[in-house]
A protein has these predicted regions:
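C-terminal transmembrane bundle of multi-pass solute transporters/carriers
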Residues: 3-8, 14-41, 46, 55-57, ...
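Hydrophobic alpha-helical segments of secondary membrane carriers
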Residues: 5, 95-103, 175, 305-310
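Hydrophobic alpha-helical transmembrane segments
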Residues: 55-66, 91-148, 211, 266, ...
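Helical-face signature of the major facilitator-like transporter fold
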Residues: 61-66, 176, 180, 268-272, ...
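Helix-terminus/helix-capping segments at the ends of transmembrane helices and short amphipathic helices
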Residues: 65, 80-85, 89-90, 192, ...
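Small-residue-rich segments within alpha-helical transmembrane domains of MFS-like 12-TM solute carriers
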Residues: 66-74, 184, 276-284
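Conserved extracellular-gate-facing transmembrane-helix segments in secondary transporters
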Residues: 73, 104, 108, 179-188, ...
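A single, central transmembrane helix in multi-pass transporters
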Residues: 118-125, 161-221
Length: 352
């Protein structure tokens, strides 16, 4: 039932995402952020005031919430490139990565604690207040929209032509999509398959092992804030190759080290720490590259296409990897997926 509800509420907004790009380019980006946060606050407040709504209203409200989230993500990336000097984008994106991943670590624990102490209505109240305060502080962002020179209104088809006509940009786009398809499914399929089913580690040890990647990402974000001058984008191919090689090695070692589970746990934790570090050193410069190299008049459509294909390929990758893991085993599936990424990295043209 929950899977059907998730599909019904997430798929329709996702299909609209490509058309949000032209809207973001036409509209006042700061105003869009305020609208999205205010709308999310209003939805939480309505659910708080009218508990137990009929299913059609709950479906419609959840779909609207997903749509607002997609719109906020696209508009915020474009606004970020408008407000920030190009030479500081990498370090500022490092700060954003640090805050995003820090919130991802703390929010579930804080939410579980609040739910246990005060119940679900307290969480709804907190969400309504948080979104409302976010909308309020966004009102004070100093913002003067840059003039966008366009011969005609922004159209989705023109955005697709722009992407296909830029070889380096399209190569990076393909690599991001490959990571979404082959690697983003790890926590849903690969890690439980290896650590829980194959090695039968307890939940506490599983949680510790998986958290190593987040710890590595947080450390890398701190590093990137201060070390943007090192220009990790210039070493992008090597970062991709080492990252995927570590993942493939973890997959290949899984069946080989079953007789020494403690050794595999230490290996998994150490490699995940490095993988989290390398992933941040790839993702943060990539976002900065897109924000500086894609013209402002194309950014809304570009980030909308990026969000759309990511949203499509991640669940497809989960389904594909589930079948592959049933056939080959989770370790071999992990290695196979990352070997595919390595081959693609070697074939495509990356920025020098």
């Amino acid at each position: 039932m929950l899977n059907r509800f998730f599909t019904l509420t997430s798929l329709p907004p996702l299909l609209v995402v490509p058309f949000l790009g032209p809207l973001v380019e036409r509209a006042h980006r700061k105003g869009l952020l305020i609208l999205c946060d205010f709308g999310a606050s209003a939805l939480c407040a309505l659910l708080l005031l009218f508990p137990g709504p009929p299913l059609p209203f709950l479906l419609a409200g959840t779909m609207l919430f997903h749509l607002l989230s997609h719109l906020f993500e696209i508009a915020s990336k474009v606004l970020f490139s408008e407000l920030c000097p190009p030479e500081r984008l990498s370090s500022l994106n490092g700060i954003k990565s640090l805050l995003d991943h820090g919130a991802a670590v703390l929010a579930p624990a804080a939410g579980a604690l609040l739910f246990g102490l005060c119940g679900f209505r307290a969480i709804l109240l907190l969400c309504a207040l948080a979104y409302g305060l976010s909308a309020l502080q966004e009102c004070f962002i100093p913002y003067a929209p840059r003039p966008i020179q366009q011969a005609e209104p922004p159209r989705l088809r023109a955005g697709i032509r722009y992407l296909l006509g830029r070889r380096e940009l399209f190569s990076l786009f393909l690599l991001v999509m490959a990571l979404n398809f082959f690697v983003a499914n790890s926590e849903e399929i690969i890690f439980p398959g290896i650590l829980v089913e194959l090695y039968q580690f307890p939940e506490s040890r599983y949680g510790l092992a998986v958290s190593a990647s987040t710890a590595g990402t947080l450390l890398a974000s701190l590093f990137l804030i201060r070390a943007a001058h090192l220009r990790p984008l210039e070493h992008l191919r090597a970062l991709f190759l080492v990252n995927s090689a570590l993942m493939a090695a973890l997959g290949l070692a899984a069946p080989l080290l079953r007789s020494v589970p403690k050794l595999y746990f230490v290996l998994f934790f150490t490699f995940q720490l490095l993988i989290g570090w390398l992933t941040a050193c790839i993702n943060v410069p990539l976002i900065s590259y897109f924000q500086t190299r894609v013209p402002l008049e194309q950014q809304g459509r570009f980030f909308a296409l990026l969000a759309f294909f990511s949203g499509i390929l991640i669940p497809l990758g989960i389904s594909y990897t589930g079948v592959l893991a049933d056939w080959l085993g989770p370790g071999a599936a992990y290695a196979c997926n990352n070997l595919c990424v390595i081959v693609l990295v070697l074939l495509v043209r990356l920025p020098a």
